[in-house]
Amino acid sequence: KKPLGKLQLLFSKAVRILGGDFRWQTLPCEFHVRIQGMNFVIFEEVPSGATYLHLSENADRDKLVSDPAFKKEFIKNMTERFRPALWNRDIGDGHVYQCPDQSIIGLSFAEIAKHRNIHVAEVFVDLLVEYGNQLIWKLVIGNERDDAINDLYADRTGSNLMSFSDAGAHIQNMANYNFPLQMLARLKNMRKNGLETISDEHAIHRLSGELADWHGIDTGYIKKGARADINVINPENLHHSLDSIVEADFDGIENFTRLVNRNDGIVNSVLINGKVAVRDDQCVETLGKSMGYGSFLRAS
């Protein structure tokens, strides 16, 4: 896995030299996803996966994956190394999270393939045929290397923004809503392991004022007369369990859950426009129900 961070920063710099104002959106934590069967957008990057996802009925999908021709095409797609893609298509990195077959929970697809002595992509299709959406697995798509992500943290050329999550569009696949806290926790751990990196002050600016400046929004700074949008956190409790994924009820939809992260013991309080919105990890009752917690932020 070759890091693309430096190449991305170079591309952004080249665009600016040519008169553009381009920034990469950077997720500053590991890109964790949880997938039911084959129901995730990364499979649209390969023809066999796109064919599967474009079928709306489960019966049609089951029929497709049971076809030997599909398995052959899927294996071919998973072994192609020169197709442009976000995902490296190493499906062996995936680990089984839930499955009717309790014996494979916690194992990677690579480990299962080794045990069965067949190609890892073939193992995946076999499990998909047998269990369908009851096969739930997890995967780290990117940002797993501290040295690579550190290049993106430390960039002072204005080539990237610490601003990408996309969890709100994939509520049953990912839960990176607390990526600012995850970034601070990762920096703490990187320093503990002897890796030279940016200061907490610089990181907080990258997560607040820098974003506001680029978007032309009058916020992101603590100063006299400014909106009092403030998070108070306990840095002693920053830890790696911030990226742990749990299921929570989705308000407004019965019997439907979404994936979230927990920040227990970290967020002391949150002020929005000077009003307390969160106290000791808990939202106050008036949040989302009464006026005054915010206003439309117009870009300049």
Where are these regions (language model features)?
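Short, well-ordered loop/turn and helix-capping segments at boundaries between secondary-structure elements
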Residues: 14-17, 129, 186-193, 209, ...
